[in-house]
């Protein structure tokens, strides 16, 4: 099956809502509409930027989509500081990131919570981008494939095959995030192929063949071409490079198969 590439720009805790508007305008200017026929492009801003991004995307009828960086497993209630999937859906979000390594590390989120958040996202017709990945010691010990397969199982626990068919998986080796180090294309393919194989066991081979698997970890315009050429890598979860509108547009154009804008 031919899977349409997805380029997702995770802005993390960067850019106020004025800066968000400027960046989306830059991306829109730098990446003409024709590219969106061949690649899906989404930005993942901080919560405080979402309404401004929504207004711009809707007003200018942009084909760019957007999403949230996290959500609560709860719909509403006494959960100070949390954001529900219902709120994100009301803002027009298409995607939401769950289980990012920074959430797992700094907020002690485990696989069970990630699975609950993925289910909450699906309940509100949001596509969860479920993140998994290993630390450097696991990679150096040669246990990276087994680690990611186990984390995938835990992070999708309780989801039906139909629900699994609606998720996106992002493999993000923790040692490569924001470090400038990037897993080689063959290394990324090794893990992404194992992810797809496990999805076949958890759901079905047909569903596994349709689910998009992204690579995340120091993705930029220089390495996206080689990464996305791999059989089981369907795009990128982009960090720092997504804050540069021109580079992000170039990256997306490469993922679309070119030519450069």
Curated annotation (Swiss-Prot):
It catalyses: D-glyceraldehyde 3-phosphate = dihydroxyacetone phosphate. Substrate binds at residues 10-12, 178, 218, 239-240. It comes from the Bacteria. It is an enzyme of class 5 (isomerase). PROSITE patterns: TIM_1, TIM_2. GO terms for molecular function: triose-phosphate isomerase activity. Keywords: Cytoplasm, Gluconeogenesis, Glycolysis, Isomerase. Pathway: Carbohydrate biosynthesis; gluconeogenesis; Carbohydrate degradation; glycolysis; D-glyceraldehyde 3-phosphate from glycerone phosphate: step 1/1. GO terms for biological process: gluconeogenesis; glyceraldehyde-3-phosphate biosynthetic process; glycerol catabolic process; glycolytic process. Homodimer. This is Triosephosphate isomerase. It comes from Mycobacterium marinum (strain ATCC BAA-535 / M). The gene is tpiA.
């Amino acid at each position: 099956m031919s899977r349409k590439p997805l380029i997702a720009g995770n802005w993390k805790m960067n850019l106020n809502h004025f800066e968000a508007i400027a960046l989306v305008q830059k991306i829109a200017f730098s990446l003409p509409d024709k590219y969106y026929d061949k690649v899906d492009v989404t930005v993942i801003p901080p919560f405080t930027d979402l309404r401004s991004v929504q207004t711009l995307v809707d007003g200018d009828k942009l084909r760019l989509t957007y999403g949230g960086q996290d959500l609560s497993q709860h719909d509403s209630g006494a959960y100070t500081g949390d954001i529900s999937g219902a709120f994100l859906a009301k803002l027009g979000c298409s995607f939401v990131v769950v289980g990012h390594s920074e959430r797992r590390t700094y907020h002690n989120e485990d696989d069970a919570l990630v699975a609950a958040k993925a289910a909450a996202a699906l309940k509100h017709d949001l596509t969860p981008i479920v993140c998994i990945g290993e630390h450097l010691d696991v990679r150096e010990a040669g246990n990276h494939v087994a680690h990611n397969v186990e984390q995938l199982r835990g992070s999708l626990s309780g989801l039906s095959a139909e629900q699994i068919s609606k998720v996106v998986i992002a493999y993000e080796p923790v040692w490569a995030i924001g470090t400038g180090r990037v897993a080689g294309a063959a290394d990324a393919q090794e893990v992404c192929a194992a992810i797809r194989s496990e999805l076949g066991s958890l759901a079905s081979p047909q569903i596994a063949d349709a689910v998009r698997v992204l690579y995340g970890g120091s993705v930029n315009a220089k390495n996206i071409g080689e990464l996305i050429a791999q059989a089981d890598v369907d795009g990128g979860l982009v960090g720092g490079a997504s804050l540069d509108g021109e580079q992000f547009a170039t990256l997306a154009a490469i993922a679309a198969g070119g030519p450069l804008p």
